[in-house]
Amino acid sequence: DGVALAIYNIEKRGQSVVIGDQTGIGKGRQAAAMIRYGLLSGYLPIFFTDRYTLFSDMYRDCKALGIKEARPLVVNAGVSVVDFDHVVEQKATCTSDEIWSPADEEDNEKYEAERMALYQKQYEVVYKAPKKSVLQDILIKGELPQDAFDYLMITYSQLKDAKRDMTRLNFLMALCGQHRVLFIFDEAHKSSGVNAGKASVITQGINMILEETPQTQCVFLSA
């Protein structure tokens, strides 16, 4: 029902929708369904979430819905997407780029990095972020390499430095000008926040994109 209502709001009303089911009810599967809908309907889906280790959970849901071949651009440098159904033998530590996060990232960053390293060793890596230099080139150019990626995976933390470095925000803005974009905001409450009466940098950045590109569609998911 949540997916049907989201699609109805997009196609008939041009409006966003909030899917607010409780934890464990299946918001991830609904988010994957919206990625699938976007791919089949000519949108460029952009999946935002709170933690980059959740990219692998989203891949699991996409796989269950028959779109495991859809190729994500992982915007978080050094991060991999793994297949939990394929355990591999222990091997040497992955030589991926160091995982980048803004300087003011929360204390759980160390835990996330350790979990990602464990994922990379224990499970088959199906997708990973491009090398840092390649990724930076994509971001600066503000366009996706032709026929290389089908959707994006990114965390809210990538916009925390937007006041100092507009590269990622400008990249997203450019994509919204070039494509019909469908944002899927997982853990949407994590993107909001008010400090000293002002909206967070993340919220301001997302609002700026939506104001400048009114044709962009959104789905918000939050328990």
Where are these regions (language model features)?
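Active-site signature of alpha/beta-hydrolase-fold catalytic machinery across serine-
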Residues: 4, 33, 37
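Conserved helicase ATPase motor motifs in RecA-like P-loop NTPase domains
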Residues: 24, 189, 210-223
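An acidic- and aromatic-residue-enriched active-site/binding cleft used to recognize and process polar
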Residues: 22, 28, 50-52, 188, ...
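Conserved pre-motif I regulatory segment
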Residues: 1-20
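SF2 helicase/translocase NTPase motor core
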Residues: 39-208
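Walker A/P-loop
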Residues: 14-34
